């Protein structure tokens, strides 16, 4: 008995479906992961950053604490053009690692008996959504723009739902001149430009009243020059929590800001600025996503307004306020 004609085409149909499988988006694969990392030297909880590098490729940066020491590893990921599968491979502790991504998780083997098993998480900064205290000057809330001016004169892409705006052409300046001490809160969201490198990834900037820039950039597992990464005092000082990338150790630019979250996720800066008496320099302390990145850094004091830089990237801002300390 001959099989029905329809059945004869099933293998071809299956091959066609596999050949045109839709790969997961970069947005769904990139991000923070947590889980376990086990190899010949031992087993421990792992924190992992999967960084989108463009054209379906990724960089996996893993770290764990074993026997009181931080151990790091780095492997590469790629997307199969036919199957759409995202796989990772490389050396971890001298052993070959093979892993694959599926539905928000990455799992695989390390050597003969080791394993990597991690799941994607979302880390929310502790001060995200922090309400302005009594007496604070609200610069951006998505509704009232009396205390902030767009240099172009036009506000663009206002999201009334979350109160965010896209940084306007030419940037934006606060209206009131700040003379002395203050606390400032800024929330920002960097766009994803996976094929870009260094300053091309989600670039903007938060200029304090004295015109010292705290850089805004997609620095999630991404390196750049001194002070040029997210949270850096531009071309002057890196954040105090820089993390090395194993393959770049020994090179000039080999670290990234450990406090940085993935692009497309809301992040927060909280800044304390204090003027000192007797002609001494002002002291600035900053937290990035709840992590202290600058501790009483000395800066030249100058009264002025805040500026938020337009650097050709659709970076978004929301919930910006400043509280002057009398």
Q: What annotation goes with each model-predicted range?
A:
Residues 1-6:
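Positively charged n-region of N-terminal signal peptides that target proteins for export
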Residues 22, 28, 32, 43-47, ...:
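Carbohydrate-interacting regions of secretory-pathway proteins
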Residues 7-16:
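Bacterial N-terminal signal peptides
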